[in-house]
């Protein structure tokens, strides 16, 4: 979209002049029983902007409420960076986020029983029609805290330019337009729920429905055209065929934030007639890969680079790996959506890039000759080096999930004096461990079979449904 047009404005749909001219949507945002028209959004968010314009940064307790929507929109209209804080975060982690970010106030809601920062409430019925100048595209929009494997969460600094670019790139790939109704029940403090779901809707101008929690029945009742969910939610959707079939009128079903198991992909496609769209990204890069609305959707693969994105695979020594659909390498990307760095951590920022400016994703992947990407998993836990072979945990997990006695599966590598690492699988289900070992050996190369299978009641996951594999290693 051309600079200087309305698209140069980050939240392009919140245009006071257009609303004053009669361009309005009565249900632009719906959260539970609450509804905000576009006129409500513009007037109330601009009123918020007037109250926070002098701040350097504000923290927003990211509950799925109209107050949160108006707080985030108002701060961005004023050009004030937003620090979204999970409502269920522990006191120590919250204190780190506030101290590290330099947030000067809670905007909107604040945690109960805390007086760590001044509080600026959001007035739902206040209105202002002042037109703020659009901040520079390089100005910071968001500081999103992402948990690493060691140390406290790091603040990922995202510019307005990066956020706008990613939404526009996805709009092209997904044929996302103002005619869509986007539905999700995801947290508003991560890329998936906040940047894509909420800010994407406020930029594109489509209707946005947040279901409060990602309950399948709520998804079915929303009657959207574009749905966002994590694999855990899609797994629950396919467990209720009536709910799944209610989504058959949707245009796109998008899965992300973790790998979508192939059996869930297949069942969702069967019940809805819609093979789901998978995409890949990170807080540091936003979304960089996706299958397309008009392209192939292949189970287990996350698609092609979005417009403007370049990817490559390298080995342990930094040499290029073949894009042959089989060779596993370390995934690196270059993208216009790249973050501006980790807040207050220049050394960690420098370490995230190689000498040529490629961002090290930390993920192992395979790239096919057609450019399609398959994510094997995190280098640290999903790339297993066993007996001289490099084995992707995801490939084994896919096979295990194809066994009728397995509901969930996670594969890790653990230190082994003979093999370097031995493959261990954790499964939820009623299959016998020895039968699963033989099942994998029959489907894949023998060296990819688990040396041990443990049947457990559940697998550890975070709020976004991602497996916490380092916890599994600790179980051994």
Question: Language-model features: where?
Answer:
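Conserved AMP-binding/adenylate-forming
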Residues: 34, 49-89, 390
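Conserved AMP-binding/adenylation subdomain of ANL enzymes
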Residues: 164-181, 189-225, 240-241
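AMP-binding/adenylate-forming core of the ANL superfamily
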Residues: 323-339, 358, 364-366
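Conserved pre-ATP/AMP-binding loop-to-beta segment of ANL
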Residues: 4-8, 19-24, 127-145, 152, ...
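Conserved beta-loop-beta connector loops within the AMP-binding
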Residues: 310-332, 351, 369-370, 431-433, ...
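AMP-binding/adenylate-forming catalytic core of the ANL superfamily
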Residues: 60, 106, 335, 340-341, ...
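Gly/Ser/Thr-rich phosphate-binding loop
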Residues: 225-229, 238-298, 310
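Conserved AMP-binding A3 loop
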Residues: 35-39, 141-168
């Amino acid at each position: 979209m051309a600079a200087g047009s309305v698209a140069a404005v980050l939240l392009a749909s919140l245009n006071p002049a257009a609303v004053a001219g009669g361009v309005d949507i009565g249900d632009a945002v719906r959260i539970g029983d609450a509804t905000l028209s576009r006129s409500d959004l513009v007037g109330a968010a601009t009123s918020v902007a007037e109250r926070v314009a002098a701040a350097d940064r504000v923290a927003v307790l990211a509950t799925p409420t109209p107050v949160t929507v108006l707080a985030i929109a108002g701060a961005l209209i004023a050009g004030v960076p937003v620090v979204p804080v999970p409502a269920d975060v522990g006191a120590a982690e919250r204190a780190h986020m506030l101290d590290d970010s330099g947030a000067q106030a809670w905007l909107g809601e604040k945690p109960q029983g805390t007086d760590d920062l001044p509080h600026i409430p959001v007035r739902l019925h206040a209105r202002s029609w002042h037109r703020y100048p659009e901040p520079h595209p390089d100005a910071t929009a968001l500081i999103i805290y992402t948990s690493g494997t060691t140390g406290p969460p790091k603040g990922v600094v995202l510019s307005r330019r990066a956020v706008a670019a990613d939404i526009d790139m996805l709009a092209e790939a997904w044929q996302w337009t103002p005619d869509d109704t986007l539905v999700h029940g995801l947290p508003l403090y991560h890329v998936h729920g906040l940047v894509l779901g909420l800010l994407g809707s406020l930029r594109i101008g489509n209707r946005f429905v947040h279901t409060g929690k990602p309950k399948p029945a709520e998804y079915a009742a929303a009657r959207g055209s574009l749905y966002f969910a994590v694999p855990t939610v899609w797994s629950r959707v396919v467990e209720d065929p009536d709910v799944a079939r209610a989504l058959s009128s949707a245009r796109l079903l998008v899965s992300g934030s973790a790998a979508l198991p192939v059996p869930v992909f297949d069942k969702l496609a069967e019940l809805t007639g819609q093979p789901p769209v998978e995409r890949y990204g990170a807080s540091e890069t936003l979304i960089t890969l996706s299958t397309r609305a008009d392209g192939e959707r292949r189970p287990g693969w996350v698609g092609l680079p979005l417009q403007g994105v370049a990817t490559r695979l390298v080995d342990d020594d930094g040499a290029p790996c073949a894009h042959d659909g089989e060779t596993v390498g370390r995934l690196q990307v270059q993208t216009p959506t790249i973050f501006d760095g980790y807040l207050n951590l220049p050394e960690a920022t420098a370490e995230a890039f190689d000498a040529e400016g490629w961002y090290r994703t930390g993920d192992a992947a395979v790239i096919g000759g057609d450019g399609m990407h398959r994510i094997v998993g995190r280098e640290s836990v999903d790339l297993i080096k066993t007996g001289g072979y490099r084995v992707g945990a995801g490939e084994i997990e896919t096979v295990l999930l194809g066994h009728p006695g397995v509901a969930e599966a996670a594969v890790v590598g653990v230190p082994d004096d003979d093999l370097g690492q031995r493959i261990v699988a954790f499964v939820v289900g009623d299959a016998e461990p020895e039968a699963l070992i033989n099942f994998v050996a029959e489907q894949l190369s023998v060296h990819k079979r688990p040396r041990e299978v443990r049947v457990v009641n559940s697998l550890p996951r975070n709020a976004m449904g991602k497996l916490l594999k380092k916890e599994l290693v600790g179980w051994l």
